[in-house]
Amino acid sequence: KRAFYFLATTESEAQSMKRFAGVLSRTTKNPMLSKVTFTDWLDLFQVVADDHPDEKKVLVIDEFPYLVKTNPDFPSILQNAWDEVLKDHNVMLVLCGSLISMMKKHALAYDSPLYGRRTAQIRLMPLQFTDVYAAQNLSFEQAVEQYAITGGVPKYMEFFQTDEPLVEQIRRVVLSKNGFLYEEPDFLLNEEVQTPINYFSVLKAISDGNHKLSKIGMTMEQDTSAITPYLKTLIDLGFVIKNVPITEKNPERSRKSLYYVSDNFIRFWFRYVYPFKGELELDNQQIVLDEMGKDFKQKFVAFAYESICRNIFAELCRKGQIDFEPSRIGSYWCNDNEGDTEIDVAAVDNQHKRLFLGECKYHAKPEDV
């Protein structure tokens, strides 16, 4: 298929139109298009429609939210262009964006001008551990510890593809003021939400080990009703996950819900970077490395290892290496007369009425059975 690809940036609408015309000029091999000053998006989209009208074409607009930031009416402009120009001219329109909240609001939401015109949507998720491990030349231990930090986000993984010891990679990429990931959560939250400070407070409270709604509220000194909207947004953005025991029949109404930071890197950042930003600004990286020496493997990696084990279990079931057809995979916990019970890997096979229970431990030495 003939393809037009346009990457939007933070620039004026006139500059965007000029660059879009350049894309059309290069793709159609018509140098005159780059010399024309376009003032109407509809004219630009008409060029796409008129190019090889009998052939199927793909028009990809990447970072679509930036065009909306420049001109809030752009979704309406695009709706008109689709209905009047593109729809009946063999054009497949693909909108991409890294700002989840804006993609939902301006492309998927019921009140968006584009609502009802999509034929599919794909939310790209981080890579699963089994896929990452299969593609890397790392020992199992190295892969687990790297994944505990990157969470399978390809861009983050790029910065950990060296032969350096992991601690040196962390120092260079995360702890250095010039490191690519030093301020990553700041950038993400500032782009996605309007009042980052409240979301920071929620993430910090959860990262400090407060997983019940009541404890998060107590830590923030706010009523639970006040922080629930923040939690919902963080869940929608993929930063937080709400877990309930695997056996709960009505998860949405469960009183056993626990909240966790689901993004591995954000969890790492709030645990080891955020509390020591003052020291890191003074280039004192050793204080973080000393803090990591206390519990990085025993607690931080061990927690991530539980979700890794659930991923491995799902993959083994899929391949038929474990005779189990899971309907749901998660974990289980309860409080009884004998104390707290926690099961790291719990799965339900509704078809055969079976339950799978497993425990996973991440230690330096093999665990006795």
Describe these PLM feature segments.
Residues 1-290:
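Phosphate-binding site recognition
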Residues 253, 257-369:
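A cross-kingdom feature that marks ATP-driven nucleic-acid transaction machinery
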